[in-house]
């Protein structure tokens, strides 16, 4: 049995002795949607006013209310259960989730297709074996909309899937989407094609980080760090916290802190509900670091307590005769970081100059200021394009250098005790 048929329990194989109309009708009507699934689909979509709302209602249910059995794709030999059995059990493999989603969608007048990822060979003459693929996503919805979805993760926002590295994915198509108006269209129960995956989320990506910190007269640091995010990083953290026991959340936050250049001990963690996917995901933690500042040093210099903004590396020098390639900047992303740092009373602060660099493909700005014993700093980078031509390598290298130079700037602190000391008098001549 072909894989598209295997993923459609109750599917029929077209009978070539019948007319095209009869064959297509059989493919459209089989398998029939079980009564319990029909009722569930009606319950889920009754208040929906369009295909987008119907698709999202079904997705939210299959994603969050049907528990995922975390098995590798094909671990059961693609032996799947009927939709009504999956619905009644409340649990499903990633293949089972497609079965249930497909049946609910059909009941609501929608269409979805399985997408196999993790392998790509568009030049092969033979159909690839199912065992070479690693994961199953879902694409579909109404006739004019195509959403990419992954209900197996349980916490992925609607339309957001794990980034796909391959240039193409394997899409399975059943022929109930072949139109009789095309007399050359083969009536077959299992078509397939290689399809380009989405290049990024269906909504703008952003990440906001705020740091509220204080340094004591002993040099100890305490800080509250909060992330608010949408996009690929959001999905990564939702999955990480969702799959980690609450008593281990400090470990996850500790890794996040290290990745952003913060050292110390995470003392508490607070996150938004990973399953509340309609809103951006938030992560907050408190971190302490003893002897962050050594006041005995003259002068005292510290970095701005902001996550380092990562940039794609400039391209290496192009070899003679090598075909020109584009410079990949990734999905357009807006990253905004802000810091407020309280210092001991009387501390004198010298802040560096801010930076502003603007290109058509990206913008970067930074600001630093001090008032009394409080330092504020902010940095923001906004990538506007996914890629730029290779011949702009020098310009991009200059942009990267400006950002890196800004992030390397230090804040100078003069303790109150030193400021109060009278200047040494010059020896008498």
Regions found by a protein language model. Name each.
Residues 1-429:
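A sensor for short, sequence-defined functional sites
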């Amino acid at each position: 049995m072909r894989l598209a048929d295997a993923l459609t329990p109750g599917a029929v194989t077209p009978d070539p002795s019948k007319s095209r109309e009869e064959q297509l009708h059989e493919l459209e009507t089989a398998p029939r949607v079980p009564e319990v699934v029909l009722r569930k689909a009606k319950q889920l979509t009754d208040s929906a006013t369009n295909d987008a709302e119907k698709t999202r209602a079904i997705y939210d249910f299959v994603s969050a209310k049907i528990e995922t059995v975390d098995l590798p794709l094909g671990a059961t030999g693609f032996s799947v259960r009927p939709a009504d059995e999956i619905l009644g059990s409340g649990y499903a493999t990633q293949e089972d989730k497609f079965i249930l989603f497909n049946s609910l969608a059909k009941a609501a007048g929608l269409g979805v297709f399985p997408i196999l990822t993790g392998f790509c060979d568009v030049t092969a003459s033979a159909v690839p074996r199912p065992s070479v693929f690693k994961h199953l996503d879902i694409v579909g919805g109404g006739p004019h909309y195509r959403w990419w979805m992954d209900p197996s993760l349980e916490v992925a926002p609607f339309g957001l899937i794990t980034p796909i590295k391959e240039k193409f994915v394997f899409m399975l198509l059943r022929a109930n989407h072949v139109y009789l108006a095309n007399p050359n269209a083969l009536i077959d129960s299992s078509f397939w094609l290689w399809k380009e995956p989405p290049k990024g989320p269906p909504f703008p990506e952003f990440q906001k980080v705020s740091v509220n910190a204080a340094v004591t007269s002993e040099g100890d640091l305490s800080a509250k760090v909060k992330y608010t995010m949408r996009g690929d990083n959001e999905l990564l953290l939702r999955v990480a916290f969702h799959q980690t026991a609450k008593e281990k959340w400090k470990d996850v936050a500790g890794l996040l802190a290290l990745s952003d250049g913060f050292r110390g001990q995470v003392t508490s963690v607070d996150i938004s509900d990973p399953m509340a996917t309609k809103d951006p995901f938030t992560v907050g933690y408190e971190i302490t670091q003893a002897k962050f500042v050594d006041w005995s040093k003259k002068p005292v210099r510290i970095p701005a307590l902001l996550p380092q903004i990562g940039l794609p590396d400039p391209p290496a020098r192009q070899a003679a005769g090598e075909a020109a390639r584009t410079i990949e900047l990734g999905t357009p992303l807006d990253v905004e970081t802000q810091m407020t740092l309280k210092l001991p009373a009387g501390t004198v602060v010298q802040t560096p100059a801010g930076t502003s660099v603007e290109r058509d493909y990206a913008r970067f700005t930074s600001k630093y200021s001090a008032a009394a014993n409080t330092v504020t700093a902010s940095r923001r980078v906004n990538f506007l394009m996914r890629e730029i031509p290779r011949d702009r390598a020098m310009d991009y290298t200059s942009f990267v250098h400006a950002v890196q130079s800004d992030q390397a700037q230090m804040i100078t602190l003069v303790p109150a005790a030193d400021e109060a000391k009278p200047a040494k008098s010059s020896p008498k001549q």
